[in-house]
């Protein structure tokens, strides 16, 4: 059954435009509360990133949940993976995150976690959607939900992150620059790395509600690159606005993407005989990652794009590590969802174990040239399914004669078609990508 509101990563859009409006959030809170209550007693955690609209939507969700008889525990600004973790530790029935992740401040959205700290099953999302179309009724006064605020949430999560590395671990002597994207990691990330002994310089940790992801964080890396060079740091770590993506910069100022970080983590676990199975990537993962893992004898499979699909594949195979080149990295030994801080700590542990710098460690993966072009798509017929686009993709694939890949897909979170071409000749790959992107734009007009 097709979902009306939920995309690949919850519900997301422009603030003030349906469905990202206060009245819809009120009804969504009620519908979610009714759905969760139908499964038993109900406590729901609610957290958010640092967008100014988060306060408005927090109040609306709180009212809707209470009207359905659900007790609400407010966490304030916290990373998305922290809310997944705290939902489990408080034994709540569900967690809700108010965030649009790496998007600008005038977007916002809602993500749900189950009581196990994982994404909601499809059947629960469909139940919520059915209730959204039903009349809203308030439970009797004696059954209204209570609302409380959790004041020590940050401290709990900081200790959880630190527990993902051995208690004897010290990063003393390591000089690190953190870019917190003026987002949800702005308090907790500096504390985690400082308490583990690193010398930390912090960028973009002064959120004002409007500057989240603005020319900073994992989607705008130039500030971090410059700071790593200026500070003569060993490496830089960039988070996105809600703390579920991480990218890095080595001491030369070069960007280290999610594929490379995933390789470093997986190789370390493999060398310590702790990998358990193989690695899950996505359709967008660089071919070089697959080849490098194969050289180590590590199985690799591709899931659809989106961390929920990576997680589903990990669960099905009982594997522990997966991720996306965008920086969503899942380390199931420690967390139930993509966690940027924990992933970064696993990378630092791997570097420490091998006695290597980040620049040295990334050399184990030789990436194939890959060009990604985003084409704005206003709606209507999916251009990926257009006959002319399909024919062009087949022609380009045939021309690369088994030495490359073509992937076109509609984004699940933004009005974009992503055109990706990968092969062994960078100039040719770029030409093919631009040709296909131009065609997609033409058929979308």
Curated annotation (Swiss-Prot):
Transmembrane segments: none annotated. The modification Phosphoserine is found at residue 101. The keyword Metal-binding applies. The keyword Oxidoreductase does not apply. Binds 1 Mg(2+) ion per subunit. Pfam families: PGM_PMM_I (PF02878), PGM_PMM_II (PF02879), PGM_PMM_III (PF02880), PGM_PMM_IV (PF00408). Catalyzes the conversion of glucosamine-6-phosphate to glucosamine-1-phosphate. This is Phosphoglucosamine mutase. It comes from Pseudomonas fluorescens (strain ATCC BAA-477 / NRRL B-23932 / Pf-5).
């Amino acid at each position: 059954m097709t979902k009306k509101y939920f995309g690949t990563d919850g519900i997301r859009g422009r603030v003030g435009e349906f469905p990202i409006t206060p009245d819809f959030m009120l009804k969504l809170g009620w519908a979610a509360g009714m759905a969760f209550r139908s499964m038993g007693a109900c406590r729901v955690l609610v957290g958010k990133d640092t967008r100014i609209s988060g306060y408005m939507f927090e109040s609306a969700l709180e009212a809707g949940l209470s009207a359905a008889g659900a007790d609400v525990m407010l966490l304030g600004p916290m990373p998305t993976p922290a809310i997944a973790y705290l939902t489990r530790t408080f034994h709540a029935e569900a967690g809700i995150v108010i965030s649009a992740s790496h998007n600008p401040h005038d977007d916002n959205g809602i993500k749900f976690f189950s009581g196990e700290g994982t994404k909601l099953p499809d059947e629960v999302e469909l139940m919520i959607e059915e209730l959204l179309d039903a009349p809203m009724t308030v439970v009797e006064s004696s059954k209204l939900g209570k609302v409380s605020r959790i004041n020590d949430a940050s401290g709990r999560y900081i200790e959880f992150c630190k527990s993902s590395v051995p208690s004897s671990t010290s990063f003393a002597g390591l000089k690190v620059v953190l870019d917190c994207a003026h987002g949800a990691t702005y308090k907790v990330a500096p504390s985690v790395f400082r308490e583990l002994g690193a010398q930390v310089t912090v960028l973009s940790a002064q959120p004002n509600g409007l500057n989240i992801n603005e020319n900073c964080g994992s989607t705008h890396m130039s500030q971090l690159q410059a700071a790593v060079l200026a500070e003569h740091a060993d490496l830089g770590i960039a988070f996105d606005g809600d703390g579920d993506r991480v990218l890095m910069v080595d001491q030369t100022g070069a960007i280290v993407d999610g594929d490379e970080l995933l390789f470093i983590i997986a190789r370390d676990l493999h060398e310590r005989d702790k990998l358990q199975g193989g690695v899950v990537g996505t359709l967008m993962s660089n071919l070089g990652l697959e080849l490098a893992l194969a050289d180590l004898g590590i199985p690799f499979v591709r899931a659809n794009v989106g961390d929920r699909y990576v997680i589903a594949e990990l669960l099905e195979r009982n594997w522990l590590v997966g991720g996306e080149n965008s920086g969503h990295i899942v380390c199931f030994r420690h967390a139930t969802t993509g966690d940027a801080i924990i992933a970064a700590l696993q990378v630092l542990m791997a570097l420490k174990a091998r006695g290597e710098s980040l620049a040295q460690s990334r050399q184990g993966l030789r990436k194939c040239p890959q060009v990604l072009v985003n084409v704005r798509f206003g709606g209507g017929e999916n251009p990926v399914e257009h006959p002319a686009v399909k024919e062009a993709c087949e022609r380009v694939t045939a021309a690369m004669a088994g030495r490359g890949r073509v992937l076109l897909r509609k984004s699940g979170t933004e009005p974009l078609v992503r055109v990706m071409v990968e092969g062994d000749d960078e100039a040719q790959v770029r030409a093919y990508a631009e040709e296909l992107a131009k065609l997609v734009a033409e058929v979308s007009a």
